[in-house]
Amino acid sequence: MGKPTGFMEYDRCEARSVEPKERIKNFDEFHIFLSKEKQREQAARCMDCGVPFCQSGMTVAGMTSGCPLHNLVPEWNDLLYTGNYQQAYNRLHKTNNFPEFTSRVCPALCEKACTCGHWGDPVSVRDNEHGIIETAYKEGYAGPVSYTHLRAHETDQYL
């Protein structure tokens, strides 16, 4: 856990989005991710609770609670807090092959399951995910992945 008292010290901060009437004028990014300092504060809010429901992805009575991809949310929040973006990206990429998409379109079920959200506002997990992947592309440690080394065992065909 990055900062044991972070959830008490910092308020939730969400990334802003460009207004729809402005969005339609161009094809630019309209989710403006948080600054590194704000991401660090939001990561500090992660309590690293004993049972991280945010990453559980459980289906109860036909409804999903937590991340269905089982993203290692407390782990990459801790890495964000310490400023280790490359390791945070590696942790994120372990369970999520397309964080560049999910950070934009995911309904953030992890935030609904966040323990911190039971007594206040949940951690801005989706915004942190967005920040991790954008930083990874900007700093050059994320990019196209080649899967040509994988082999389909039954057909002996290469992917």
Show which residues each predicted segment covers.
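Electrostatic cytochrome c docking/interface patches
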Residues: 31, 35-36
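Cationic, low-complexity basic patches in intrinsically disordered or flexible, solvent-exposed regions
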Residues: 158
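Glycine/serine-rich phosphate-binding loop and adjoining beta1-alpha1 elements at the start
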Residues: 40, 44, 48-56, 62-146
